[in-house]
């Protein structure tokens, strides 16, 4: 098995067939809807909130609302659908969450997307939740995760998952590898690659994205959608407290399994950091799209499909030029 991560890979260009990168199409059909980009902000409290979720939906971007304000979920679904927008929520696997799914069915509230959001998703509890959702609200598109193995992908798909999230602890504020000894940190892209060999349904690459080029690499190795935390954090519109350190503006960013999220120091697998303020989210999304259009033009195509077949080289400890002083 080849082991590599994002920084080890360079994609090899093909002959360009477009006159301008603006001709390249970055849209993706994911579940019932089509989106402008194959990216989704991480469903974390310092990355996504209700206001941002609405903005993303209005502008044809995919989002997943976090699950850390449980009481707000039903009003959120109603508000989004009454506004003519899609509802995309997260659930856990505790007993109350199974009751919550039944309540949605009773009230005939059908979110277009439901993400089962668990650190170790290759588990009986997640499989049971997938089956429970598919029994009570079969029309919802179910995303399940997270997993790091082909066996995990196969089991969740066989249980009824419509898409699977791949990544165990590769994120910037995740310390699973350090705390437990397990994870895909340091080989996330290779894990995605081997999982894609088993997948019959879409995969979401979750964690380890440090540059826009990593989005193209994720698609090359099997992702339909790419979940991004730190690159989406610390914008003007982002949740999280703004602080000034040494004359510069920063916003807090913490992991879903951190004590800042949990409110207690128990089973902690995440940390908190301050990310330098990045300005407008609109500008970041625009730049992301332009960079992905350039990637497609280098791949010799006109849409995202062209990225799936490009050749690549593994270059350990690449020489950086232009991106490091």
UniProtKB/Swiss-Prot annotation:
Is the keyword Secreted assigned to this protein? no
- Answer yes or no on keyword NADP: yes
EC annotation from Swiss-Prot or TrEMBL: 1.7.1.7
Which residues are responsible for catalysis? 174
Q: Which SUPFAM superfamilies match?
A: Inosine monophosphate dehydrogenase (IMPDH)
Q: One of this protein's GO BP terms?
A: purine nucleotide metabolic process
Catalytic activity reported:
IMP + NH4(+) + NADP(+) = GMP + NADPH + 2 H(+)
Q: What class of enzyme is it?
A: oxidoreductase
Q: Among the entry's GO cellular component annotations, what is one?
A: cytosol
Cited Pfam families = IMPDH
Q: Which PANTHER family match?
A: GMP REDUCTASE (PTHR43170:SF5)
Instruction: State what this protein does.
Output: Catalyzes the irreversible NADPH-dependent deamination of GMP to IMP. It functions in the conversion of nucleobase, nucleoside and nucleotide derivatives of G to A nucleotides, and in maintaining the intracellular balance of A and G nucleotides.
Which protein family is named in the record? Belongs to the IMPDH/GMPR family. GuaC type 2 subfamily.
For this entry, the protein name equals GMP reductase
